């Protein structure tokens, strides 16, 4: 959608309760349209199961949590965002000039952390319990990511 911002919440997991089959269609997806250029003052999204896609959003303060599901952030920016998942992968795709300014803290118990080479953070591994962490210092927004069993990907365009 040229000139439109939208937010996609997949509620396809509900189809299992009705059909006994997992199914994702336009009928079981919640899409929130927000006027272009608007910034969310506060965002709180919590799901038990299902994927979350945020596209072209600006969030001042937010928490996004899912127990089981992947999260996709495309061309988003924020001042303070905390992302937490028990089982699911996290993908951040954005512009290099925006992502390089973020203060990022990533912690994962069982999962990989893949970071674009242009980002200048530091990867650390705890050899005793195999935890991975990644830290980047910047002058922009603060991003805190915690996952128990999932991969984290930070990719610049």
Identify the role of each PLM range.
Residues 1-65, 70-73, 129-146, 151-157:
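Right-handed parallel beta-helix
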Residues 73-157:
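Short, surface-exposed interaction patches in beta-rich subdomains
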């Amino acid at each position: 959608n040229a000139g439109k911002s939208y937010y996609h919440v997949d509620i396809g997991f509900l189809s299992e309760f009705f059909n006994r089959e997992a199914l994702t269609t336009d009928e079981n997806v919640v899409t929130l349209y927000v006027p272009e250029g608007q910034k969310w003052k506060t965002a709180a999204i919590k799901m038990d199961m299902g994927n979350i896609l945020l596209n072209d959003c600006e969030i001042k303060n937010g928490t996004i949590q899912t127990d089981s599901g992947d999260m996709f952030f495309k061309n988003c920016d924020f001042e303070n965002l905390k992302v937490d998942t028990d089982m699911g992968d996290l993908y951040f795709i954005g512009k290099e000039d925006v992502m390089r300014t973020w203060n990022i803290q990533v912690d994962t118990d069982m999962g990989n952390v893949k970071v674009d080479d242009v980002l200048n953070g530091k990867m650390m591994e705890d050899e005793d319990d195999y935890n991975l962490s990644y830290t980047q210092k910047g002058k922009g927004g603060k991003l805190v990511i915690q996952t128990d069993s999932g991969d984290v990907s930070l990719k610049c365009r």
